[in-house]
Amino acid sequence: MSDKELANFFDWFFEIGYSEIVFADKAIFYEGDTERLFIRKAMTLEKYKKLSQQYIAFIQVGGAYAKNYEKLIKLLGIKSLIITDIDYEKEKLIVADIEDSITTNATIKHFYSYNHPNDISSVKNLYAWKDANENIMDNLIYICFQTGNDGYARTLEEAMLNKYFSMNVTDTYKKSEWIQKRTDSKLNFSIPNKKNDKKISEDDIVSIRDILASTSGNKTDFMYSVIMNGYVENIMPKYIDGGLTWLMK
């Protein structure tokens, strides 16, 4: 980002959230409304009650821009959790292909390059980076994203469904089985009726990625169903739990 672009970014930032982060005890950077709803509800759980007793600044920022807050975080010395998506190629559904895939997330690439300037930001390398706790910068910034422990998810919603149904993105079920899962769980997700312009019968195989593609326009409704059914603790992805646990320290 050029100096002019950075200046424009901070002009905009001052208008929307400067006072909130300056006076905060800690900060959570997140991508969208579903993350905000989920994290705010999670902070009411006994496990994370220390966070509810502090002034936490919530800053909405996409994966391409969260890295731009690094200098400000360091200047203010505010312990910050950046929650983002690993964003590998969505068509990858085999573990080996997933691990070879490259993230498109600019913030993850930026922070990964500090430790590994000459390495590609493949999913396999990023998993190892996180396992080595290199995603934590000076105990001040924690880059929080999905790993193999979240069923190889690439988004929050995938990680949540993987956790609740004890599955991986590589797993598939018949459409009829997904219908039963939705009925039993009372979770509000969509099941596609068509794939590649062909009607899907109840015996046809549907992946979790098909489910999320069909639900993409109703993510907020899905999140409300999680909250209203009291599933926040049981559906908590490991990557989010790890980030919130670190932030409490």
Where are these regions (language model features)?
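Acidic, Mg2+-coordinating catalytic modules of nucleic-acid enzymes
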Residues: 4-7, 11-29, 33-249
